[in-house]
Amino acid sequence: MITDRVSDYLEKIEKSDVNAFIDVNSEKVLKEAEELEKNDALKNKPLYGKIVAVKSNINVKGYKISCASKTLDNYIGTYDATVVKKLRSQGALIVGMTNMDEFASGSSGETSYFGPTKNPAAMDRIPGGSSSGSAAAVAADLCDMAIGSDTGGSIRNPASHCGIVGFKPSYGVVSRQGLCDLAMSFDQIGPLTKNAEDALVLTNAIKGIDRSDSTSLETPKFEKKDISNYKVGVVKEFMDVTDEKIRNEIEKGIEVFKDMGCKIVDLSYKYIDLALPTYYLINYVEFFSATRKYDGRRYGEFIEEACGEEVLRRILIGKHISEQEFSGKYYKKALQARKSMKKEMLGLFNSADLIVGPTVPKLPHKLGENLSPMEMYAYDVLTVPTNICGICSGVVRCGNISGVPVGLQIQGAPLEDEKVLSAMIEFEKNY
């Protein structure tokens, strides 16, 4: 019975000390489970009875959509985002809203107004961010699967740290309608799951064109493909910036592709040093623009007075860069760099079907450990190129270091999501 499974998860959530959830409405989800059991029309849908957690920056009617900030602490969603409507239409149940870095501004899960999320795979370490609660909820078995958002690695980073699967679809594959955006030209919604097969199913369920999001695209259903004759690229610079212990685990993962019949191709990406400055300059400007609606008049509090340190830092830098005298000096140069980075990245896919490598360059730090902003941003160096270039990218578990999970990142060209998801599934089977 679905209601029994929901009750089991609710009990687990209640007992959990991971702090994965911000808002759970037991009465609401149990009532929805009872209604779902009577709904014969949904019984053959791919997500029938699946219990899904949703990141707190995606609108779900009747739940607190706080973005893990005091700014929106009292804001209750008045509608379902397009992805949530799609989940419900496929027979899924929403169990609650997950914790996250405040306004998705962070890579650790520690900047939330509601307190840090713990990493179920290594309880003394960060789970990664910003989709920290979604990843932790899946890793701690507090739901079947979860939805997160990825602006510069916010699905893939915590998936790697928590030892689960995460997938960032190509830009436009999934509607962003109902997402509280961080940086609209980078943001994409995607799945966090216990295995790669589920990532394929969940991506198919939430993707598709949406009139409410002009960037959204229609794509055929993603199917599993044979990858045995694929050329798999390994970028020297991605490996070079990575901690040796992680690199050793990733090299074992690359051998798995070789054993599957793939040809390994050595590649070079000369723009790796531009990745973080380009990403963050554009991010700051777009985030400053996105936060102007949080003025304390219509709903919530005035963001600059209510937000945490990292969010305020990004707003102030974004405001500074947006001023006319600095726009050309910083922002326009960042846009030019983005164009060059994208051209170079897309060129790599002329030599390879996929690019594989590490997800993060270092292991997650211990909870409460003080890192400078630049040390924190360094977690993103291998994930932001995906968002800058609008390509697709997934993460699967690839070993561990003293019990701390390591994730292998698989990248594909724009709209080659099917290839990446297929490779994730095959890697998992053969690892």
UniProtKB/Swiss-Prot annotation:
Keyword match ATP-binding: yes
The protein's role, per its UniProt record: Allows the formation of correctly charged Gln-tRNA(Gln) through the transamidation of misacylated Glu-tRNA(Gln) in organisms which lack glutaminyl-tRNA synthetase. The reaction takes place in the presence of glutamine and ATP through an activated gamma-phospho-Glu-tRNA(Gln).
Family classification: Belongs to the amidase family. GatA subfamily.
GO MF annotation terms: ATP binding; glutaminyl-tRNA synthase (glutamine-hydrolyzing) activity
Organism whose genome encodes this protein: Methanococcus maripaludis (strain C7 / ATCC BAA-1331)
Active site: K55 (charge relay system), S130 (charge relay system), S154 (acyl-ester intermediate)
InterPro entries found in the cross-reference section: Amidase, Amidase_CS, Amidase_dom, AS_sf, GatA
Stated name of the protein: Glutamyl-tRNA(Gln) amidotransferase subunit A
HAMAP family: GatA (MF_00120)
